[in-house]
């Protein structure tokens, strides 16, 4: 029959953990090994007194297995379409970007080559000018043809116009019937003839204005005749007791400047 101390050891060993029960039987050597193992575990803790006193760093954690890391990477990698995967496998991104920038730069250089050939000269690109179309005045489609007046009709109309430029309705009706014309034709002819007479009158007035303008400029006017030496002498103080001799006056045509600047030679 087992002693009570042995029973207590069995119960304590059951409480400590399954590692202690798994052995063949408790012995003095097994108990010492378990105590040493507990001391090692306690001393290996980073917050234990022994670890703080010894100032030892805890051992680094071992890296996970490569299979686990590969599986984690496979789970974290986003899903891609088949086309994307092939494109990434055959053409990496860093190699494509310089090629794209180089192609853009080459295109820009080709565009600017024509501008940089002659740096001292500005030559804008040629413009394609569209030919200018001559816009003519469009006549009305329902326009009536001009009335071909005969010579006798024109003479009668001119004679009537010199007598009276404005006809009343009764006079116009009577005159048009005598010439075998409509009232509208006579009315339009008189309107055109009055406009022509007005233009001729304005041209005559313009000719009269041009003829009335003096040939000499307006500032070239003399208040006295040049050939009268007495009036010229009176301007220079001839009434004083000491008279200046009157000098002969040269003709005015020899001077290009106005008369006041050198008409008289004073000594």
From Swiss-Prot:
Residues 142-201 bind DNA. Keywords: Developmental protein, DNA-binding, Homeobox, Nucleus, Osteogenesis, Repressor, Transcription, Transcription regulation. InterPro entries: HD (IPR001356), HD_metazoa (IPR020479), Homeobox_CS (IPR017970), Homeodomain-like_sf (IPR009057), Msh_Homeobox_Regulators (IPR050674). One of its GO terms (biological process) is negative regulation of transcription by RNA polymerase II. GO terms for cellular component: nucleus. Residues 53-63 have a biased composition (Basic and acidic residues). Its main location: nucleus. GO terms for molecular function: DNA-binding transcription factor activity, RNA polymerase II-specific; RNA polymerase II transcription regulatory region sequence-specific DNA binding; transcription cis-regulatory region binding. Residues 1-74, 105-147 are annotated as: Disordered. PANTHER family: HOMEOBOX PROTEIN MSX, HOMEOBOX PROTEIN MSX-2. Belongs to the Msh homeobox family. Interacts with MINT, with XRCC6 (Ku70) and XRCC5 (Ku80). This is Homeobox protein MSX-2. It comes from Bos taurus (Bovine).
């Amino acid at each position: 029959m087992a002693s009570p101390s042995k029973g207590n050891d069995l119960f304590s060993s059951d409480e400590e953990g399954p590692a202690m029960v798994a052995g063949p039987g408790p012995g003095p050597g097994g108990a010492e090994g378990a105590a040493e193992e507990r001391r090692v575990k306690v001393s290996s803790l980073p917050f234990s007194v022994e670890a703080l006193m010894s100032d030892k760093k805890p051992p680094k954690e071992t890296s996970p297995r490569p299979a686990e890391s590969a599986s984690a990477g496979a789970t974290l990698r986003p899903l891609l379409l088949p086309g994307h995967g092939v494109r990434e496998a055959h053409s990496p991104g860093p190699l494509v970007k310089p090629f794209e920038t180089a192609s853009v730069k080459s295109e820009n250089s080709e565009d600017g080559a024509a501008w940089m050939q002659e740096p001292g000269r500005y030559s804008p690109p040629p413009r394609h000018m569209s030919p200018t179309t001559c816009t003519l005045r469009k006549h009305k489609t329902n326009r009536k043809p001009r009335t071909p007046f005969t010579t006798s009709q024109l003479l009668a109309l001119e004679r009537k116009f010199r007598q009276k430029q404005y006809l009343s309705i009764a006079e116009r009706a009577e005159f048009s019937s005598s010439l075998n014309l409509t009232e509208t034709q006579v009315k339009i002819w008189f309107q055109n003839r009055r406009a022509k007479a007005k233009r001729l009158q304005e041209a005559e007035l313009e000719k009269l204005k041009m003829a009335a303008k003096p040939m000499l400029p307006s500032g070239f006017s003399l208040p006295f005749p040049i050939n009268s030496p007495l009036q010229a002498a009176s301007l220079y103080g001839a009434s004083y007791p000491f008279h200046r001799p009157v000098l002969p006056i040269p003709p005015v045509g020899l001077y290009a400047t106005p008369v006041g600047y050198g008409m008289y030679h004073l000594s």
